[in-house]
Amino acid sequence: MISLTDTQKIGMGLTGFGVFFLFFGMILFFDKALLAIGNVLFVAGLAFVIGLERTFRFFFQKHKMKATGFFLGGVFVVLIGWPLIGMIFEIYGFFLLFRGFFPVVVGFIRRVPVLGSLLNLPGIRSFVDKVGESNNMV
């Protein structure tokens, strides 16, 4: 098992709560307050898990500036009160930022017993195969 420091454990909790609040905010018709809290918790949790320096290095790489602009711009737009537009920017930026991790995630999920069989369903399989391609990594 992977050994985590206390700071990383706090970061995992913050990230988990951030994802929960983002999901819950979208379920409740893009509630501004929940989405704003979720954004702040997610970004803070990421910084706690991988460290401040590595977080800045990840977000501000030269080839990821467009993705970072959309993601952080979306966070800002949500914080000023336009949740639907902000979430569209954020989701686009998130996919641009983290698309290099998708093949790894898809490969892992395919090995999980119940989820792996769900990913092999006819309508879902073609989409997951396209997302899981490793040639579109940045």
UniProtKB/Swiss-Prot annotation:
The keyword Transmembrane helix applies. Residues 31-32, 90 are lumenal. Pfam families: Got1. Belongs to the GOT1 family. It comes from the Eukaryota. The modification N-acetylmethionine is found at residue 1. It is a multi-pass membrane protein. The lineage of its organism: Eukaryota, Metazoa, Chordata, Craniata, Vertebrata. Keywords: Acetylation, Golgi apparatus, Membrane, Protein transport, Transmembrane, Transmembrane helix, Transport. Residues 1-9, 54-68, 110-138 are cytoplasmic. This is Vesicle transport protein GOT1B. It is found in: Golgi apparatus membrane. The keyword rRNA-binding does not apply. GO terms for biological process: endoplasmic reticulum to Golgi vesicle-mediated transport; positive regulation of canonical NF-kappaB signal transduction; protein transport; retrograde transport, endosome to Golgi. May be involved in fusion of ER-derived transport vesicles with the Golgi complex. Widely expressed. Tends to be up-regulated in seminomas compared to normal testis. GO terms for cellular component: cytosol; endoplasmic reticulum; Golgi membrane; membrane; protein-containing complex. The gene is GOLT1B. The chain crosses the membrane at residues 10-30, 33-53, 69-89, 91-109. InterPro entries: Got1, Vesicle_transpt_Got1/SFT2.
